[in-house]
């Protein structure tokens, strides 16, 4: 089955690569229209997925992530229309010039070819990824979570209808709808057809992909994010940032999970933190140095376990650790961070500069929330993932990250001397 999908995707990628920006936008507009026109089919499929998930004991938070409503589906369709408004990077000349030989050389952006994406049970990801791949002239093979298999199948069928109505092959967007996990291992070895693989899931999936994939893998999305509270910080302003970074959307990968507090400000900062976290419903996981003082406050407090410094809670839980100084904070981030997003809150710009230079994460912030690590917030439009590695993309992956480049030389029957 996957072999045939790979063949179809590779053939479709050749046709997609030849489309103009106007033609690609016409396809995206048709997809958005069809998502709305066939919304009942998608919503009915989603209702079955949610019912099964509820019967299997999934939490209310997870059920909310799975569920589609008419308003959410319209929002997804509108997001596709927003992709139409983004600048198309394909065909852009990055640099070039005329060589001494007379050869005119340029470096031009081109599609990658076929993208494979393995992702969690979020129905919006199916459309988001498909629209970004089509905008950049790439075919895509999707493998979504089993909890949304009906929703994904219905959504991809709608997308394929739109593709065919525009004269394009259905193989441009395909989904593996069989939940058998053995197919993931098979997909990881499809280097004959898939040019880049993006896993969006937990640490186990990322480890599996790194160890078994014969395809170049872009890993990321696991966010053990830190905020270091420096001794020179303005406490009231710092608390606003921390509340935003922890509570705005706790289930996202750019949410802060560990707060590192300079020991010289702990006595004045911790009581204020406890009050604010109590109001926000956050449970604090405190180290020995912070535990007694936080237990005297109104927030719920438990003793931190050593392994929790490596946890991505994705919930209203926050580690709190007292550190000696900036060096201690940086050392902790180097040991426990995932190179996603880390921040310093300080009035000392020398410390800020050191933090920026020495913390090796894809996004580093000074006096700002980690929640900004997002394609839309960065002005990239939608994102296909957040990469925490260094090749070939880093941070939020917008349209440019779904392209590569080729060298084009134009001569006048020019030969090398």
From Swiss-Prot:
Pathway: Amino-acid biosynthesis; L-proline biosynthesis; L-glutamate 5-semialdehyde from L-glutamate: step 2/2. The keyword Nuclease does not apply. It is found in: Cytoplasm. It catalyses: L-glutamate 5-semialdehyde + phosphate + NADP(+) = L-glutamyl 5-phosphate + NADPH + H(+). One of its GO terms (molecular function) is glutamate-5-semialdehyde dehydrogenase activity. GO terms for cellular component: cytoplasm. SUPFAM superfamilies: ALDH-like. Catalyzes the NADPH-dependent reduction of L-glutamate 5-phosphate into L-glutamate 5-semialdehyde and phosphate. The product spontaneously undergoes cyclization to form 1-pyrroline-5-carboxylate. It is an enzyme of class 1 (oxidoreductase). GO terms for biological process: L-proline biosynthetic process. InterPro entries: Ald_DH/histidinol_DH, Ald_DH_C, Ald_DH_N, Aldehyde_DH_dom, G-glutamylP_reductase_CS, Glu-5-SA_DH, GPR_dom. Its EC number is 1.2.1.41. This is Gamma-glutamyl phosphate reductase. It comes from the Bacteria. Belongs to the gamma-glutamyl phosphate reductase family. Keywords: Amino-acid biosynthesis, Cytoplasm, NADP, Oxidoreductase, Proline biosynthesis.
């Amino acid at each position: 089955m996957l072999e045939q999908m790979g063949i179809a995707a590779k053939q479709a990628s050749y046709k997609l690569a030849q489309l103009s920006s106007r033609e690609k936008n016409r396809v995206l507009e048709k997809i958005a229209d069809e998502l709305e026109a066939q919304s009942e089919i998608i919503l009915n499929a989603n209702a079955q997925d949610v019912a099964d998930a509820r019967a299997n004991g999934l939490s209310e938070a997870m059920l909310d992530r799975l569920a589609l409503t008419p308003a959410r589906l319209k929002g997804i369709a509108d997001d596709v229309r927003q992709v139409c408004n983004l600048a198309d990077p394909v065909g852009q000349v990055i640099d070039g010039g005329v060589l001494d030989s007379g050869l005119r050389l340029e470096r031009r952006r081109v599609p990658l070819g076929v993208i494979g994406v393995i992702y969690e049970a979020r129905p919006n990801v199916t459309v988001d990824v498909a629209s970004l791949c089509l905008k950049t002239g790439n075919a895509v093979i999707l493998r979504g979570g089993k909890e949304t298999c009906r929703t994904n199948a219905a959504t991809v069928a709608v997308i394929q209808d739109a593709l065919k109505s525009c004269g394009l092959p259905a193989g441009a967007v395909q989904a593996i709808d069989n939940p058998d996990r053995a197919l993931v291992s098979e997909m990881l070895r499809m280097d004959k057809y898939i040019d880049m693989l993006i896993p969006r899931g937990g640490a186990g999936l990322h480890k599996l992909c790194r160890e078994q994939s014969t395809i170049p893998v872009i890993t990321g999305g696991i966010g053990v994010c830190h905020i270091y509270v420096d001794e020179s910080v303005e406490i009231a302003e710092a608390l606003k940032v921390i509340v935003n970074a922890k509570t705005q959307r706790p289930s996202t990968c750019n949410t802060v999970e560990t707060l590192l507090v300079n020991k010289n400000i702990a006595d004045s900062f911790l009581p204020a933190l406890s009050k604010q976290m109590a109001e926000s419903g956050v449970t604090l996981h405190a180290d020995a140095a912070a535990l007694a003082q936080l237990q005297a406050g109104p927030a719920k407090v438990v003793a931190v376990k050593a392994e929790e410094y490596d946890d991505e809670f994705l919930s209203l839980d926050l580690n709190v650790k007292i550190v000696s100084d900036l060096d201690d904070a940086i050392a902790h981030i180097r040991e426990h961070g995932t190179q996603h997003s880390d921040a310093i809150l300080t009035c000392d710009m020398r410390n800020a500069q050191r933090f920026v230079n020495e913390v090796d994460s894809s996004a580093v912030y000074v006096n700002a929330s980690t929640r900004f690590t997002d394609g839309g917030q960065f002005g990239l439009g939608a994102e296909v993932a957040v990469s925490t590695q260094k090749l070939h993309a880093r941070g939020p992956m917008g349209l440019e990250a779904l392209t590569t480049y080729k060298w084009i030389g134009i001569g006048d029957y020019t030969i090398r001397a």
